[in-house]
């Protein structure tokens, strides 16, 4: 459960849009990465509402949840589900703090899996993810979006993640949706809206 929530969280931060995707040229890819990296390195805080849709093979209906994500540079992340249930997960000080409808717990985040997940979530908001040596990256585009498709090189991550797509609207350098395919074939899509960049975030957002 914790790993699924954490993986979904990396889901930090683009769209499943049924347009034809084509590969970017080398020049286009370099320009895209440079632009995103330059713009997002100025991000100190980021907040957004989200809607998450999870499709699982053994369920006929998708599981839809919603909530709020808050990020504070360099590596503090809050992921709070509010509907249809309350569940919070906070990455802070090399630990993962969890509040499952009033039941609180913490997990050491220094394990390779949790450490990587946290790094990827934060990296997706500051452009550093593009240079992560544990992922191969392909760059695609369509009429409305630039797309970065990440495939894990690490055998450890491949146990959980098959592929992650970050979709950036053409006129933006922050992710508007994340689409993840797990090793099992289950998929998770997170759509972000009402995004606020560098707005003050109360300390209470990063505590349970």
Where are these regions (language model features)?
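Sec-dependent N-terminal signal peptides
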Residues: 5-14
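Short hydrophobic/aromatic-rich beta-strand segments that constitute the beta-sheet cores
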Residues: 50, 77-81, 96-99, 148-150, ...
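Short glycine/serine/proline-enriched coil/turn segments at secondary-structure junctions
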Residues: 57-61, 88, 156-159, 184
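Flexible, processing/modification-adjacent segments and terminal tails
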Residues: 21-25, 37-42, 54, 61-62, ...
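Extended beta-sheet lipid-handling architectures
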Residues: 48-50, 64-66, 163, 192
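An acidic-aromatic
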Residues: 22, 68-119, 188
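Gly/Pro-enriched, hydrophobic low-complexity segments
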Residues: 130-208
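N-terminal leader/targeting segments and the immediate start of mature chains
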Residues: 17-51, 55-60, 204-208
């Amino acid at each position: 459960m914790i790993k699924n929530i954490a993986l979904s969280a990396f889901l930090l931060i683009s769209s499943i849009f049924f347009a034809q995707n084509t590969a970017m040229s080398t020049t286009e890819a370099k320009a895209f990465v440079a632009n995103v990296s330059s713009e997002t390195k100025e991000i100190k805080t980021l907040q957004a509402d989200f809607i998450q849709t999870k499709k699982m093979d053994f369920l006929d209906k998708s599981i839809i949840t919603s909530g709020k994500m808050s990020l504070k540079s360099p590596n503090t992340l809050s992921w709070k589900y509010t509907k249809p249930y309350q569940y919070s997960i906070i990455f802070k000080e090399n630990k993962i703090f969890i509040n499952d409808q009033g039941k609180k717990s913490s997990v050491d985040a220094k394990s390779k899996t949790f450490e990587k997940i946290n790094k990827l979530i934060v990296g997706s908001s500051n452009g550093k993810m593009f240079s992560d040596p544990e992922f191969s990256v392909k760059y695609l585009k369509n009429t409305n979006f630039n797309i970065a498709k990440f495939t894990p090189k690490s055998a450890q991550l491949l146990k959980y993640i098959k592929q992650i797509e970050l979709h950036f609207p053409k006129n933006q350098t922050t992710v508007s949706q994340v689409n993840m395919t797990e090793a099992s074939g289950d998929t998770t899509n997170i759509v972000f809206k009402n995004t606020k960049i560098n707005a003050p975030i109360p300390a209470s957002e990063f505590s349970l």
